[in-house]
Amino acid sequence: MSELLDSFETEFAKFYTDSNLEETNLQKCLDHTHEFKSQLKKLKAHLNKHIQESKPEVYNKLSDKEKQKFKRKRELIIEKLSKSQRQWDHSVKKQIKYVSQQSNRFNKSTLNKLKEFDIDSVYVNKLPKETMENVNEAIGYHILRYSIDNMPLGNKNEAFQYLKDVYGITNKESTEFIEMGQIVHDLKKGDTESCLKWCSNEMESLSSNHTALSSLKFDLYTLSAMQIVKHGNPVELYYQITQNAPLDCFRHREKELMQNVVPLLTKSLIGQPIEDIDSKVNKELKECTSLFIKEYCAAKHIFFDSPLFLIVLSGLISFQFFIKYKTIRELAHVDWTTKDELPFDVKLPDFLTHFHPIFICPVLKEETTTENPPYSLACHHIISKKALDRLSKNGTITFKCPYCPVNTSMSSTKKVRFVML
């Protein structure tokens, strides 16, 4: 499986024309098409001028030499038009041919190999039918998390009905995400007011992360300033600098201000052109949107990454271990005996492992399970249920904590649930 993943990465990279995986051959087609359109516009302007000059009242006044020159000029325009069309046609056909060939190679070398084994034979414990409700809920969450900003959100009632009719998502599930989607919609349209309002409301809450929200507020101000610079309105820009500047967010950000905002504002005020302003605005918009979604999810206590996405990603990464185990099982004639524990270790990145809390009982030196959960004593030391039953003789006596002198009874213990902070 590791070889297949390496092959997958290598073949996929061939769809791009640079090592940073930013420009594809299809993007080159688009760039060449834009260039061709620009040339057509220039040639159209030349032709319009030529048509005006070819009117009888103008043309008849020309000398024979000027008429020859006029005719040659028309031929050059036609020749240049024909040459531009041929170059564009050749370039587009070449890129499309390359993409088509690479797509066929990609299917042959990677995608077809994914179908060479049966997934059900790799993982033998099937998903119980009673868990399908949880699966549907995870799918609904995934749709809400990643697609809400692309859905029609004219008003909340219409959005609720749309999500229910199309995806079967209840109003309870979609309530939190619709507000997020509406704010992201506004940001994409260049309106930062709703996001700033949400940010200010959250900063009044004692439980919010004020440092992160202050960063978001600063980035929103930067985005607004860039958008005004882009539209070239000096009066509005002056008002933005003097009246709308969030001074409380400027603390400890002098370096960012000097690097990102001040040069743009200065050039705009003195009338100098700003290179690549569109890409600068788009980059800042993406940063604001990403930071807002992250802080919104944290404030509403919802996952930033969809659990479904994390589970599928974990499955893809761990597939190589499952396939290796399948081979060993067939050769050694061993079987999988447990349903809640894998017979082998799976190495996953840290961000994929925080949903699986592990606690080793310090008394019995064994991992807690669903049948043997962790319990907190009166002194807040934690041991397993099996150790608790043994020390309390099944709840009939009080006992001293194994790690401190505090006495504990069964009634003063509480079951422990680990949460991600």
From Swiss-Prot:
UniProt keywords (A-Z) are: Cytoplasm, Metal-binding, Transferase, Ubl conjugation pathway, Zinc, Zinc-finger
The record, for Pfam families, names:
CTLH
Chain ranges of the CTLH domain: 176-236
SUPFAM superfamilies (UniProt xref):
RING/U-box
GO MF terms held by the record: ubiquitin protein ligase activity; zinc ion binding
Q: How does it assemble?
A: Identified in the GID/CTLH complex. In the absence of stress, the complex exists as an inactive anticipatory complex (GID(Ant)), composed of VID30/GID1, the E3 ubiquitin-ligase RMD5/GID2, VID28/GID5, GID8, and the RING-like subunit FYV10/GID9, awaiting a substrate receptor to form the active E3 ligase complex. When cells are shifted to glucose-containing medium, the substrate receptor VID24/GID4 is induced and becomes part of the complex, named GID(SR4).
Family of the protein in this entry = Belongs to the RMD5/GID2 family.
The name under which this protein is listed is E3 ubiquitin-protein ligase RMD5
Recall the taxonomic lineage recorded for the source organism: Eukaryota, Fungi, Dikarya, Ascomycota, Saccharomycotina
Encoding gene, per UniProt annotation: RMD5
